[in-house]
Every structure is written in structure tokens, then in C-alpha cells.
């Protein structure tokens, strides 16, 4: 399908990273950087706060124009690419958990008439947590969300459904929820 649309398919890292423009979700590894050509454009989550100076010196030495997409703002000064990735990650995490439940325990994530719903504990009420919550509820799971931010919990409570239990992270409450959870 991609090749029919004009894309070239290759297994060669040198070919992939040797282009004028490289788009990559994760930052390139040291090995992958070797293949970047001078003056190429790299658009990636560079995770600047997790990298040392040498990483960026190497990019500079190769004269790579690196754009950290985690800092690209839209016209409303929102980090919309990061939000989008969080939305995708939240939804996919629940779909993946559903698949693992089915393969390992023979359980379904969704609610089935007469069967106790699967219990899902979500740690974090940010964008990823919001979309994980939406996906889990959509599949019929019983969901509980924990976060240390009261404002994030309020926001989630308003956006999702006031019937979804939310809680500040209290060690005793969290431990009880984790012991009962089918998915975390």
C-alpha cells in the first residue's frame, strides 16, 4: 500500500537515516546518528532534559538541523504534538492491556452481562491517563484513577464521567486498588 503511493521500502538504516528529512518519534540512538547526513533535518522528540551535551555536540558536528517536536507550539501556544502522542499512547495502552489479558488469563477487558467487569487502575490524570480512562470505560471496564494533582483529577472528573472514582495518591488506598486490579 505504501509503495503503491510512491514510498520506497528498505531495511537499510543508512538509507532511512541518510535522507534530507528524518521524522522519528524516539530520539535517534548514537548508532542511528552516524547515518544522518550533513544539513539534514531531524524532527523527533529529542528529550533534551534526558540527554547530555555530547549528544547535541554530535548533532551539531554533523550540522543536523534538529527540531524537538515536544516544543512545537500551535497557534494557541499549546504543545499539540505532545498531546496527540499522549492521546494515542493512552488509547493504545488499554488496547494492549486487553490483548495481554486475553492471551495470559483468557479474560476480556470489557464488561459482559453477568460477569464482574475488569478492574483498571490508571496512575496519572494527564492526557495519557485521560485517554486510557476513556478507552477502558469504552470497553466496559471498571476504572479508578489516581494522581497527586487535584486540578488534573477535577479536570478528568469533568471531562469523563463523574462516576469514575478518582483519588489523590494515598498509599493505603492505592495499595488496595492495586491488589484488586486486573490492569494497571
Region spans (language model):
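N-terminal beta-loop-helix "entrance" segment that forms/cooperates
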Residues: 1-8
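Glycine/serine-rich phosphate-binding loop and adjoining beta1-alpha1 elements at the start
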Residues: 30-119
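Short, well-ordered secondary-structure micro-motifs within conserved domains or adaptor modules
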Residues: 17-27
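General beta-strand structural signal in soluble alpha/beta enzymes
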Residues: 9-11, 24, 44, 66-69, ...
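Short, well-ordered alpha-helix to beta-strand connector turns
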Residues: 6, 19-20, 39-40, 63, ...
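A short, aliphatic-rich alpha-helical micro-motif
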Residues: 14-17, 36, 175-182
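Glycine-rich phosphate/diphosphate-binding loop of Rossmann-like nucleotide-binding domains
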Residues: 1, 104-183
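Short glycine-/small-residue-rich Rossmann-like dinucleotide-binding loops
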Residues: 26-27, 46-47, 170, 182
Amino acid at each position: 500500500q505504501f509503495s503503491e503511493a510512491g514510498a520506497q521500502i528498505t531495511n537499510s538504516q543508512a538509507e532511512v537515516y541518510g535522507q534530507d528529512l528524518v521524522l522519528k518519534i524516539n530520539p535517534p540512538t548514537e548508532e542511528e546518528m552516524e547515518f544522518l547526513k550533513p544539513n539534514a533535518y531531524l524532527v523527533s522528540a529529542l528529550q533534551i532534559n534526558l540527554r547530555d551535551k555530547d549528544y547535541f555536540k554530535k548533532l551539531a558536528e554533523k550540522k543536523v538541523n534538529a527540531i524537538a517536536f515536544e516544543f512545537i507550539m500551535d497557534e494557541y501556544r499549546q504543545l499539540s504534538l505532545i498531546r496527540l502522542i499522549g492521546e494515542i499512547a493512552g488509547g493504545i495502552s488499554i488496547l494492549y492491556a486487553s490483548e495481554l489479558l486475553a492471551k495470559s488469563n483468557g479474560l476480556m477487558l470489557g464488561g459482559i452481562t453477568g460477569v464482574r467487569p475488569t478492574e483498571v487502575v490508571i496512575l496519572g490524570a494527564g492526557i495519557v491517563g485521560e485517554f486510557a480512562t476513556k478507552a477502558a470505560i469504552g470497553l466496559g471496564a471498571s476504572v479508578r484513577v489516581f494522581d497527586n494533582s487535584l486540578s488534573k483529577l477535577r479536570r478528568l472528573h469533568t471531562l469523563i464521567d463523574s462516576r469514575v472514582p478518582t483519588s489523590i495518591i494515598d498509599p493505603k488506598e492505592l495499595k488496595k486498588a492495586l491488589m484488586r486490579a486486573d490492569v494497571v
